[in-house]
């Protein structure tokens, strides 16, 4: 026989450490003797740290007794009152047990802490001494400190596994309101996050500032942690109490991979912050061009005005003097004439901040193109003198020369060419000003451009030359001008690519020269610009 008492459920006593609560653990002593009572005594080696109730007693044959072990944390000023070693304590306990034949036990409690100490001296009896009792500290304070330290994954796992499920230890918070997930994220530890997620924490629990774990990870740029949280069904919209949602954090901080993950998981691209900013506002404010581009590709609206100033993203880009961001927003359809709560357009904001390089894109380019379209040479001159860019383009690649040539404004064409405008600039479909003049039937403009050195062999993206266009329209005079100017007739017998079935870019065809041109068209299949003119450019880049 090597022992008289069996420890249940094991030799490890779990003592739960919680702020403001008694640190208490329990262990059951089972008398394994069938016929005789057993006397016991438990003593901690460091008696000031623990109180044991009962410390001694007599257990009837095959009976059990629950022992309470209370831990007294250190009471030091400025200390976190954690045990000196955890989760497994270095402290030792001695369990003495001895047979007590003939002991009369009328009421078991009457024998608690009343067993004479000399019963446990080996001089009188055979005393069994067991030092197997060990203390393991569990609870919120232990777990949060283990995660904060991050040194032992095994210890964290063991504490979580041994904790009573009713305690919900996996949702423990530290004194600052940080959950285990928040702490692991702050330590940039995806391995810890993975471990904690195995125990099914409240994945939407907020910390003291109202942020969910996903919001915290999105802000800190931890893409792997974000991916883990999303895989465990974290809400992409975050908490209603927080100022920023996950998509706002990612956009503001420039975390492209996280932004992409959130959008793939259905995050609302135009969700608002507490002050009414969208993710696009934040990306523009912080000059996160890649994030802005991704948001726009996913349908972000460019016309949303925030709550405080009533600014659109374009207002913010203009205030920052961010030329590339302005061009990006305009290319994606931002309206430049929206006014904020102070009645200012993006141009006004750029002007008051001294960002003159934005003037062309935000207003002067429009004025230049409008003047060219109308043939107003004086206005063209004033715009250029005010800083307008002569080779400025709108979002479809049109220059003022394209407009003037298409409308047949000879004086405007001549003035622009004399000022050095690019004769052979192409729009995004590959049309030059010569294509425009030829297609719209303006022989004088066509001849002038040819004489000034315009490339008569220039072809659109579909391989169509100006000569092919006028041949298909039976413009004999313009055909002669182009041929005399050096245009090759080679390949004219081939069928040119068919025209698009609808107007590209949603632009409006004017009823003047274009409708007249359509009446002159032959029945042959042809490739025509057909939609070159429009009343107001959306952007000049």
Curated annotation (Swiss-Prot):
Q: How does it sit in the membrane?
A: Peripheral membrane protein
Which Pfam family, any one, appears in the UniProt record?
Answer: Ank_2
Chief place of localization: cytoplasm
Q: Which GO terms describe its cellular component?
A: cytoplasm; nucleus; periarbuscular membrane; plasma membrane
Summarize the protein's role: Required for arbuscular mycorrhizal (AM) symbiosis with AM fungi (e.g. Glomus versiforme and Gigaspora gigantea) both during fungal passage across root epidermis and for arbuscule formation in cortical cells; this symbiosis promotes phosphorus (P) and copper (Cu) uptake. Essential for infection by symbiotic nitrogen-fixing rhizobial bacteria (e.g. Sinorhizobium meliloti) leading to the formation of root nodules.
Q: How does it assemble?
A: Interacts with EX70I at the periarbuscular membrane (PAM) around the arbuscule hyphal tips.
Protein name in UniProt: Protein VAPYRIN
- Its source organism is Medicago truncatula
């Amino acid at each position: 026989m090597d022992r008289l008492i069996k420890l249940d459920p094991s030799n490890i006593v779990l003592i739960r450490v919680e702020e403001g609560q008694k640190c208490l653990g329990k262990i059951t002593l089972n008398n394994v003797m069938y016929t005789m009572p057993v006397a016991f005594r438990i003593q901690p080696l460091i008696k000031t740290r623990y109180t044991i109730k009962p410390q001694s007693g007599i257990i009837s044959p095959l009976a059990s007794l629950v022992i309470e072990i209370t831990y007294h944390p250190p009471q030091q000023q400025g200390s976190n009152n954690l045990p000196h070693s955890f989760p497994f304590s270095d402290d030792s306990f001695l369990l003495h047990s001895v047979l007590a034949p003939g002991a009369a036990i009328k009421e078991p409690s009457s024998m608690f802490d009343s067993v004479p100490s000399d019963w446990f001296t080996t001089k009188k009896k055979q005393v069994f001494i067991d030092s197997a009792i060990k203390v393991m500290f569990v609870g919120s304070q232990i777990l949060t400190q283990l995660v904060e330290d991050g040194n032992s994954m095994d210890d964290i796992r063991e504490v979580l596994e041994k904790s009573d499920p009713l305690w919900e230890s996996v949702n423990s918070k530290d004194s600052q309101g940080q959950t285990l997930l928040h702490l692991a994220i702050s330590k940039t530890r995806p391995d810890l996050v993975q471990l904690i997620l195995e125990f099914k924490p409240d994945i939407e629990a907020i910390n003291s500032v109202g942020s969910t774990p996903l919001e915290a990870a999105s802000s800190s740029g931890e893409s792997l942690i974000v991916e883990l949280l999303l895989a465990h069904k974290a809400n992409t919209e975050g908490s209603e109490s927080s100022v920023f949602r996950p998509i706002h954090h990612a956009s503001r901080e420039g975390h492209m991979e996280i932004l992409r993950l959130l959008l793939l998981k259905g995050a609302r691209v135009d969700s608002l912050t507490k002050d009414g900013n969208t993710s696009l506002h934040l990306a523009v404010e912080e000059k996160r061009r890649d994030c802005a581009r991704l948001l726009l590709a996913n349908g972000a609206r460019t016309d949303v005005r925030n709550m405080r100033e009533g600014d659109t993203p374009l207002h913010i880009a203009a205030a920052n003097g961010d030329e590339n961001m302005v061009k990006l927003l305009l290319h994606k359809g931002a309206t430049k004439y929206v006014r904020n709560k102070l009645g200012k357009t993006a141009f006004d904001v750029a002007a008051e901040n001294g960002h003159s390089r934005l003037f062309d894109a935000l207003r002067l380019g429009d004025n230049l193109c409008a003047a060219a379209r109308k043939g107003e040479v004086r206005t063209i001159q004033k715009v250029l003198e005010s800083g307008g860019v002569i080779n400025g383009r709108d979002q479809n690649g049109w220059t003022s020369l394209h407009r003037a040539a298409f409308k047949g404004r000879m004086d405007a064409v001549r003035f622009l060419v004399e000022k050095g405008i690019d004769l052979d600039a192409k729009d995004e479909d590959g049309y030059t000003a010569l294509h425009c003049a030829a297609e719209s039937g303006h022989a004088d403009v066509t001849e002038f451009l040819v004489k000034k050195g315009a490339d008569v062999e220039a072809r659109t993206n579909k391989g169509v030359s100006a000569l092919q266009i006028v041949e298909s329209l039976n413009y004999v005079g313009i055909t002669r001008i182009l041929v005399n100017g050096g245009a090759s007739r080679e390949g004219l017998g081939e069928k040119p690519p068919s025209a698009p079935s609808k107007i590209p870019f949603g632009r409006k065809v004017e009823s003047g020269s274009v409708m007249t041109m359509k009446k002159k068209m032959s029945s042959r299949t042809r490739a025509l610009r057909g939609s070159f003119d429009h009343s107001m450019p959306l952007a000049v880049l």
